[in-house]
């Protein structure tokens, strides 16, 4: 129960994935944003399984790999922030495609918040007397997916809710600048 609460709080608080989901909802609507939502949940579920199961210890014991993930992830997130800021208005929601399932799944592996959440969970919620590392890690991954789906949907729906207010080009531009700036700020807060 403690981990589920942790997972809900981690999944619903602002961060790069939720900003991406909000932008997906605002620019393409809920239905076209669902693959992005499922990708975020899948990526975090896999990460929550693999990091506690052993990948995390490899990354933490290899400073160069950790540094590459740290700075490479930050660079990618800043690039994504720039793409959000500079995205132009298209004619219809049907023409706007948000980040898809695979992109959102892979995105979790370069998202600094995802690494912080999964390594924190590994250190906090794995217990030697609670069973094998594999079974505990599988439970963490499954529970995180259960928490991430409704939590991420809140952000996706929020974006879709503001979509009607963004028909005006000036408002859409301001919204995209704010979303991109928030993503860049989240990178700065996590990295430095």
Residue ranges of model-derived segments:
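Juxtamembrane transmembrane-helix termini in multi-pass membrane transport proteins
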Residues: 1-67, 120-140
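Hydrophobic/aromatic residues within the transmembrane alpha-helices of Major Facilitator Superfamily
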Residues: 8, 12, 45-46, 53, ...
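Hydrophobic alpha-helical transmembrane segments in multi-pass integral membrane proteins
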Residues: 48-52, 110-122, 181-192
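Selective transmembrane alpha-helices of multi-pass membrane proteins
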Residues: 61-89, 151-155, 164-192
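Flexible cytoplasmic inter-helical loops of multi-pass small-molecule transporters
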Residues: 86-100
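Anionic-ligand binding region
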Residues: 96-105, 111, 122
């Amino acid at each position: 129960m403690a981990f589920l609460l942790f997972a809900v709080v981690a999944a619903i608080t602002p961060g790069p994935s939720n900003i991406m989901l909000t932008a997906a909802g605002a620019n393409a609507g809920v239905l076209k944003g669902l693959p992005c939502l499922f990708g975020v949940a899948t990526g975090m579920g896999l990460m929550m399984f693999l990091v506690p199961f052993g990948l995390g210890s490899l990354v933490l014991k290899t400073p160069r790999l950790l540094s590459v993930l740290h700075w490479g992830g930050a660079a990618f997130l800043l690039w994504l922030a720039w793409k959000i800021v500079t995205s132009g208005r298209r004619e219809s929601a049907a023409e706007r495609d948000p980040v898809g399932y695979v992109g959102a799944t892979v995105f979790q592996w370069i998202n600094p918040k995802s690494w912080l959440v999964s390594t924190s969970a590994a250190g906090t919620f794995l217990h030697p007397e609670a069973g094998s590392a594999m079974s505990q890690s599988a439970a963490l991954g499954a529970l995180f997916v259960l928490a991430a789906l409704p939590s991420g949907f809140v952000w996706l729906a929020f974006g879709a809710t503001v979509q009607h207010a963004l028909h005006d080009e000036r408002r859409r531009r301001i919204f995209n600048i704010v979303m991109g700036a928030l993503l860049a700020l989240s990178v700065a807060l996590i990295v430095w």
